Structure formats: structure tokens, C-alpha cells
């Protein structure tokens, strides 16, 4: 449910900015779905720089379900967030039946990373930065 997804992403650290119903042909011209009925919730990251739109379509009916596809599937099926305490967050996300896809892996002294299956089967990457070196710093060295 959309309420469950909002609660899940709130637990990760995002903030609900607002939610609303979007219906009709005009909105459907944006998505290419025609006469649609969808409830959206806009979540914002704690720094205010990024937003994540969650949606629940009532019409038209869903025609494909990719929730259990692996991380290398074609399409936009995953998102990653930097978090402060990965182990603590994983415990808090258990109430949403979130499961680590394989394991938490540490990359040097820089990051601890994992993918989880969250609400509605969403594939979410979680990254805990361990030191002051950022992903950009690492990429610049290469």
C-alpha cells in the first residue's frame, strides 16, 4: 500500500512532502496511460536536494510486475540511499519485512553496502559511509 511505502521510506530518513490523487486524460498524456487514476506521494531526502515520487495506480490496471527481478534487470528498478547506521536501520526495517538480498559488504575503509527487498518488492540500495572519503573522491582517483 502507499501508506506502507511512505512509512518504509520515512524509516530510511525521507520526509513526506505531500500526497494527492492525479486523475484523468490530461495526467494520462504525461505518462502515456490515457485516462489514469493514481495517488502519488512525494518524499524528500533529509538534505532537501532530491525527491522520490511514490505512486499507486488504480487505473489502468498494472500489466507487468517486476518486483522480484534481480538487480541487473533492464529498466529503472532500484534506488540507493546513503544512511548513517546501516545495522540499526536494517533492524528497524524488519517490521516492513525488508530482507537483505545477499549480505552487507564492506569496501575498504570507505563504505558498507547492501541491497534490500523492501515494501512491494522494491529493490533499495543502502550505503553507510565509514570515513570522510566520498564515492566522488574514490572515482576521481581512478
Residue ranges and their predicted role:
Residues 1, 84-85:
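Localized edge beta-strand/strand-to-loop motifs within extracellular or lumenal beta-rich domains
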Residues 61:
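Conserved short histidine dyad/triad with adjacent acidic residue
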Residues 19-21, 39-42, 50-52, 65, ...:
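Vicinal oxygen chelate
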Residues 69-73:
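Non-DNA-binding regulatory cores of transcription-related proteins
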Residues 1-49, 95, 114:
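Core segments of cupin and vicinal oxygen chelate
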Residues 38, 74-78:
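Short, solvent-exposed beta-strand edge segments and adjacent coil->beta transition regions
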Amino acid at each position: 500500500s502507499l501508506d506502507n511505502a511512505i512509512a518504509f521510506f520515512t524509516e530510511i530518513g525521507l520526509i513526506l512532502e505531500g500526497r494527492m490523487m492525479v486523475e484523468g486524460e490530461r495526467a494520462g498524456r504525461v505518462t502515456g496511460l490515457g485516462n489514469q487514476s493514481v495517488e502519488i506521494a512525494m518524499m524528500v531526502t533529509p538534505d532537501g536536494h532530491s525527491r522520490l515520487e511514490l505512486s499507486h495506480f488504480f487505473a489502468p490496471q498494472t500489466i507487468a510486475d517486476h518486483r522480484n527481478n534481480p538487480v541487473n534487470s533492464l529498466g529503472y528498478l532500484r534506488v540507493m540511499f546513503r544512511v548513517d547506521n546501516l545495522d540499526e536501520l536494517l533492524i528497524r526495517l524488519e517490521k516492513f519485512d525488508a530482507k537483505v538480498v545477499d549480505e552487507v559488504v564492506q569496501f575498504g575503509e570507505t563504505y558498507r553496502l547492501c541491497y534490500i527487498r523492501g515494501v512491494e518488492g522494491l529493490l533499495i540500495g543502502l550505503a553507510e559511509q565509514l570515513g570522510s572519503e566520498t564515492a566522488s573522491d574514490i572515482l576521481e582517483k581512478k
